[in-house]
Amino acid sequence: MTAPSQVLKIHRPDDWHVHLRDGDMLKTVVPYTSEIYGRAIVMPNLASPITTVDAAIAYRQRILDAVPAGHDFTPLMTCYLTDSLDADELERGFHEGVFTAAKLYPANATTNSSHGVTSIDAIMPVLERMEKLGMPLLVHGEVTHADVDIFDREARFIDTVMEPLRQRLTALKVVFEHITTKDAAQYVRDGNDYLAATITPQHLMFNRNHMLVGGIRPHLYCLPILKRNIHQQALRELVASGFTRAFLGTDSAPHSRHRKETSCGCAGCFNAPSALGSYAVVFEEMNALAHFEAFCSLNGPQFYGLPVNKGWVELVRDEQQIPENIALADDSLVPFLAGETVRWSVKK
């Protein structure tokens, strides 16, 4: 019997979906991402969404100002799609290397999405332009109709929005972000080379029982919400299969403790401190460590048409203790897996 590996050496990974926020929160959370990842797709859903080239340039600079000396990190900026967005502004940002992709939030689907898109028809000229440019569309894949159960929002989105959109724009590159269901896993698996998906550590590690049985755990509450264990298992099987159009996207989404532990708490898991080790745990549990590097470091660049990072990261079989909380200026952050240990840690 072969002894389990003690070291995992992979090309420096990228995070293809992260929320870095702004202000003091940004200064606190950026180093957890920039220390490990070479690049990150930065979500544009600030309180004032990133809808112009100038706003993206300014936000990118605030991020870079928060990167500690010695970290080699490039934020990849995204444009927040709205019903009134100017396609020329989007194209300018893409050609100038400011916008890497554009983000579709259905209106009111998640944090700071009230400015989001009300219908695909409203932004069809913009999407047609993106198809011509080869610019990826990043999709929060949930419908938000009041009559649709929250656990069914993703599956309904596939039937009513995603598939009609991809039928109309057959060469549009689409990332189905943070997929959570067996429906989405199968849909992406059956798709063509223009369709990919990101998957978070929490949706691979947990299901809704973990969040709701024996007491409600607000720090596992995120959107899309954790689903049944059959959906969790489908996601685990997808990544364990070595499927090349699924890649790392943490959806790390920090909120202060008082905004999570309250009568109406915010959605989001701040998983940046533990995400890479958490993914390694899942791949090891699935006997799929052979596919770990591709998921973290190779599949994303291949889909985006970007080079693989030149540097390397080593994970060691050395238990990492996740802190109970992380200080903020006037509050604290409770990270994903707070107080627990993860058996793979990034070698410093």
UniProtKB/Swiss-Prot annotation:
* InterPro entries (UniProt xref): Amidohydro-rel, DHOdimr, Dihydroorotase_CS, Metal_Hydrolase
Name positions with the PTM N6-carboxylysine.
Answer: 103
Catalysis performed (reactions) = (S)-dihydroorotate + H2O = N-carbamoyl-L-aspartate + H(+)
> What residue range is the signal peptide?
none
Q: Which GO terms describe its molecular function?
A: dihydroorotase activity; zinc ion binding
Cofactor(s) listed in the protein's UniProt record? Zn(2+)
* Residues that, per the record, bind Zn(2+) 2: 103, 140, 178
Q: Which HAMAP family match?
A: PyrC_classII (MF_00219)
Concerning its family, UniProt says: Belongs to the metallo-dependent hydrolases superfamily. DHOase family. Class II DHOase subfamily.
Q: What is this protein called?
A: Dihydroorotase
Write the gene name: pyrC
